[in-house]
C-alpha cells in the first residue's frame, strides 16, 4: 500500500531543475532509501516532502488524497510527517529530558495537562533516553552534549513522536560505530511499529542492511528503483 506519492514533482533554483519531473510511490511501513551523488536532488526532495520549500510543479500526496501542493508548508506535520536534518536541531537551552518530554506532550510540557499524566510521560522519556544511553545526562542542557550525543537525541525524539512518515537526512553522518548501531536499531524499531521511513544515506552497507526499497537519483531525476541488492548490483552510486 502506497502511503506517499509524488507526481511530476519539480523544484527549480535559478532556472535549474533540482528535482525534475519526479514521480515515485513510497510503500507504507517500509524503509525506503534515496541514494545518488552529491547534488543529485536528494535533500531537495526531502525538503519538498516535508514542506520546507514550495513546490514549483507537480504534487506530493499522502495516502492518495492529501495533496501537499494545496496546503501550507507548515501544516505538513499535521499529516503525520516529521524529519531530521543534516545539521542537528534541538531545543538547545532545554535539558535532554525536556527535549523528549516536549515531543511526548506535543509542547504542553509546562501546563496542567502535562502534570496530569506526568508519571506516564516521564516513564516513556526514560525508556527512550535509555535506548540511546543518555538517561544519565537527562538534566544536562542539550547545547552541552557532544555532536554524536546531540544527533542521537534528535533521532530519539522521533521515537517519541506520533508521526507515521519519518524523513531522515543522513542520520549516520559523523557518528562513531557504536552510535551507528544505536541509530540502526531505532530505524528498525520504527519499521516494527509500522512507521514509514525515508532515508538519505551514502553508506551502501547500511543501505543493504536497512532498506526494503531504493530510489536512485541524479540531476534531479529518478534513474532506477527496486530492491537494494538488485539496484546496487547494477549501479555504482557515490
Can you say where each PLM-predicted feature lies in the sequence?
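The feature captures the beta-strand-to-loop junction immediately N-terminal to the Walker
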Residues: 35-37
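Catalytic Walker B motif of ABC-type/P-loop ATPase nucleotide-binding domains
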Residues: 166-170
